[in-house]
Amino acid sequence: MNTALAQQIANEGGVEAWMIAQQHKSLLRFLTCGSVDDGKSTLIGRLLHDTRQIYEDQLSSLHNDSKRHGTQGEKLDLALLVDGLQAEREQGITIDVAYRYFSTEKRKFIIADTPGHEQYTRNMATGASTCELAILLIDARKGVLDQTRRHSFISTLLGIKHLVVAINKMDLVDYSEETFTRIRKDYLTFAEQLPGNLDIRFVPLSALEGDNVASQSESMPWYSGPTLLEVLETVEIQRVVDAQPMRFPVQYVNRPNLDFRGYAGTLASGRVEVGQRVKVLPSGVESNVARIVTFDGDREEAFAGEAITLVLTDEIDISRGDLLLAADEALPAVQSASVDVVWMAEQPLSPGQSYDIKIAGKKTRARVDGIRYQVDINNLTQREVENLPLNGIGLVDLTFDEPLVLDRYQQNPVTGGLIFIDRLSNVTVGAGMVHEPVSQATAAPSEFSAFELELNALVRRHFPHWGARDLLGDK
């Protein structure tokens, strides 16, 4: 146990009292992102070090590792606290998404350290999908780069509304206010093109030296704003799902004995209470909530984000992937949708291909009807493309094999977020955010089956000399 933790426990009056205090602290999930070598891992290491979250044995190990793998000369290489893979330490880069936990007197934090290299953009998107705030690091010597723009766009695409632009390595530009002002202006000019109403803040800092990370810098008297830690401790996060209608995706049917049948899952949005009239989709059957069962016992009501088991008054057919919502809400099932896609596979995404789709516990199949555009992250313009390459971001039209109940991702990430799975290798090849569900009345009917379209795409790709026509293009 480190001395800081021991002191906190003593101040709270024992381990049990300390654990209760921890449970009542608010939790902030955030990620660090930016271009390669901007100092993301070093910043997290500095946060852990300056908030005294490192155990004595970890600190001793860090001294030894800094001598073998360090890139900071005689100084501690704080990035090694986060970069755990051997390849990461040898190359001095981040490859995988690394998660770390720490807490202060005001708040608990879960950090996702994401890679900066373009070929690992898919890892960055994975890390951003569960976060509420993004720290975008910019090297003060280089300014705003392509990866900065890419990560900014992906973060906002995944619903992150709070961006902290940390202009790092200020010590290498002599803590120049002019440099900070120029980069701030450049980023704000770019950010005008980002979607949504964003909360953007700027902090000049040096992760290596500790300036403006957890304590105010004496080297930058011209900056009177909060430190990075103060921003993280005080930012107010308004969760979108709290204000949304009730959504309860069924994860599994809990049947421990003959006398109990419950439907387990995590309440995706809204609230539910005992006695509430609910509807099961896609069947449309209605019932009342008889019990709300949790690990700590029965509850009268539950809120978004809580893992619960619902017991209904009627025995009706409900299975994994079904959705429970308020009975008076009209939410039609759809079979088509336009989806924002971040592609993560070497094999491009092309019209006519079919993939397994997973969304809110349900697994089905979808066909790619077409690619409307790919986003150029340099200027956020849209351009027409025939396929979506690795790390490409674009808007895609999908048709599902069965009707699904979908929300727009910006309204509900659980019922609006999906993944693409390769049907042969079972590898996740893409992430999708529902842009707009297409109602059955406006969905264009297809005269070809999913199998026919997939076979057509296969023949055109591998046997072009046969001269097979494009069924999608010739409709």
UniProtKB/Swiss-Prot annotation:
Keywords: ATP-binding, GTP-binding, Nucleotide-binding, Nucleotidyltransferase, Transferase. InterPro entries: CysN_GTP-bd (IPR041757), CysN_II (IPR044138), CysN_NoDQ_III (IPR044139), G_TR_CS (IPR031157), GTP-eEF1A_C (IPR054696), P-loop_NTPase (IPR027417), Small_GTP-bd (IPR005225), SO4_adenylTrfase_lsu (IPR011779). Residues 25-239 form the tr-type G domain. GO terms for molecular function: ATP binding; GTP binding; GTPase activity; sulfate adenylyltransferase (ATP) activity. GTP binds at residues 34-41, 113-117, 168-171. GO terms for biological process: hydrogen sulfide biosynthetic process; sulfate assimilation. The keyword Transferase applies. The keyword Transferase applies. Belongs to the TRAFAC class translation factor GTPase superfamily. Classic translation factor GTPase family. CysN/NodQ subfamily. With CysD forms the ATP sulfurylase (ATPS) that catalyzes the adenylation of sulfate producing adenosine 5'-phosphosulfate (APS) and diphosphate, the first enzymatic step in sulfur assimilation pathway. APS synthesis involves the formation of a high-energy phosphoric-sulfuric acid anhydride bond driven by GTP hydrolysis by CysN coupled to ATP hydrolysis by CysD. This is Sulfate adenylyltransferase subunit 1.
